[in-house]
Swiss-Prot record:
InterPro entries: Aminotransferase_I/II_large, Asp_trans, NHTrfase_class1_PyrdxlP-BS, PyrdxlP-dep_Trfase, PyrdxlP-dep_Trfase_major, PyrdxlP-dep_Trfase_small. The modification N6-(pyridoxal phosphate)lysine is found at residue 242. Transaminase involved in tyrosine breakdown. Converts tyrosine to p-hydroxyphenylpyruvate. Homodimer. The gene is tatA. Its EC number is 2.6.1.5. Keywords: Aminotransferase, Phenylalanine catabolism, Pyridoxal phosphate, Transferase, Tyrosine catabolism. This is Tyrosine aminotransferase. The keyword Glycosyltransferase does not apply. The lineage of its organism: Bacteria, Pseudomonadati, Pseudomonadota, Alphaproteobacteria, Hyphomicrobiales.
Length: 389
């Protein structure tokens, strides 16, 4: 029976990790893998996470099942962080998920169960978006969201896609810190998006994976909160991997903004049912850590301060890198004004390969770089290697 299976292609980013590890050159640089790294090249554990884990170790008295919906206090605290007081809490359904990927898959399965077949996806996007949606049976319509040579969001294309979408279609939006481009939507553009989505009867699915990495915790969800205040229905997939440094703990959630308490209850029951037939229930530890941090003023303050330090470091790295890159590409001065961990450089696959073989700089063939993979002292030198191609 197993002989009937075709071998699946390796994930390009995972393959890149393997190549990087085998490279014995001391000056090698990993700009591919999407994790935050500090000045020593480590992916640190937040101080508040360590403190919360210690507290849980001392106080947790059971490992019993928690159910498909997950930790309800975690969901309440996370929604307060994401949605604020934008809408009535009883109109929001939430289910804890195994990370942001689990949230996106549950959202896609819910859309399919409701009879929705199509979802609009701006390109480039996170490489796993399309496979997740396809696996749920959704048809994907695409449009060009970002122009790499000019380093600019093609907002007219986004507007045209929304205007051309059929009522009931879903549309994937990045809340902030766009992966992989770092492209930024203005407040006015978010207002136009919200008005169009409401007018066209579309269902927004908003991917929130980097809250606090762009302009700040509240600023990074300002557009999302405006959208939630305008549209009657929306889905929000939240990941705690980056904002809390809980990558391998798989802590996330899917939230549904509905128009009534009764509607929220229906959505919640369907999300829980979909979870039950998939992974049954989410892992508890990461969510318990997040809940503990957000519930404790001192831990929350410490977490917020450390997150802000990381954000400011990435902002500084962007400025240093952009200063060097603009000597070859004037448009890449825009890298300094982009948000989050990622930017996309106008490099060919051959140039990406040269960077790897000649300089030990590892990045995907697409030209996407992880800003947080740089060290401050080497940013100018790395920029010089890019511009020397």
């Amino acid at each position: 029976m197993f002989d009937a299976l075709a071998r699946q292609a390796d994930d390009p980013l995972l393959a890149l990790i393997g190549l990087f590890r085998k490279d014995e050159r001391p000056g090698k640089v990993d700009l591919g893998v999407g994790v935050y790294r500090d000045e020593t090249g480590r992916t640190p554990i937040f101080r508040a996470v360590k403190a919360a884990e210690k507290r849980l170790l001392e106080t947790q008295d059971s490992k019993a099942y928690i159910g498909p919906e997950g930790d309800l206090v975690f969901l309440d605290r996370l929604w307060e962080l994401v949605g604020g007081d934008t809408i009535e809490r009883s109109h929001v359904a939430g289910v804890q998920t195994p990370g942001g990927s689990g949230a996106l898959r549950l959202a896609a399965d819910l859309i399919a169960r409701m009879g929705g077949r199509g979802i609009w996806l701006g390109l480039p996007s996170w490489p796993n978006h399309a496979p997740i949606f396809k696996a749920a049976g959704l048809d994907i319509a695409t449009y060009d969201f970002f122009d790499i040579p000019s380093q600019s969001v093609i907002f007219d294309n986004l507007v045209s896609a929304l205007e051309g979408a059929a009522s009931g279609d879903a549309v994937l939006l990045h809340a902030s810190c766009h992966n992989p481009t770092g492209g930024v939507l203005s407040e006015a553009q978010w207002m136009e998006i919200a008005a169009l989505v409401a007018e066209r009867g579309l269902l927004p699915l908003v991917d929130l994976a980097y809250q606090g990495f762009g302009r700040g915790l509240d600023q990074d969800v300002a557009g999302l909160r405006h959208l939630l205040g305008v549209v009657p229905e929306a889905l929000v997939a939240v990941s705690c991997s980056k904002s809390f440094g809980l990558y391998r703990e798989r802590a996330g959630a899917i939230f549904a903004r509905t128009s009534s308490t009764a509607s929220a209850d229906r959505v919640r029951s369907n999300l829980a049912g979909l979870a039950r037939t998939s992974y049954s229930m989410p892992p508890d530890h990461g969510a318990a850590v997040v809940r503990t941090i957000l519930d404790d003023p001192e831990l929350r303050r410490d977490w917020t301060e450390e997150l802000e330090t990381m954000r400011l470091r990435m902002t500084g790295l962007r400025r240093s890198l952009a200063e060097g890159l603009r000597t070859r590409w004037q448009s890449l001065g825009a890298v300094a004004d982009q948000e989050g961990m990622f930017s996309m450089l106008p490099l060919s696959e051959a140039e990406v390969m040269r960077l790897r073989t000649e300089h030990g700089i590892y990045m995907p063939a697409s030209g996407r770089i992880n800003i947080a993979g740089l060290k401050t002292a080497e940013a100018a030198e790395i920029a010089g290697k890019f511009t020397s191609l």
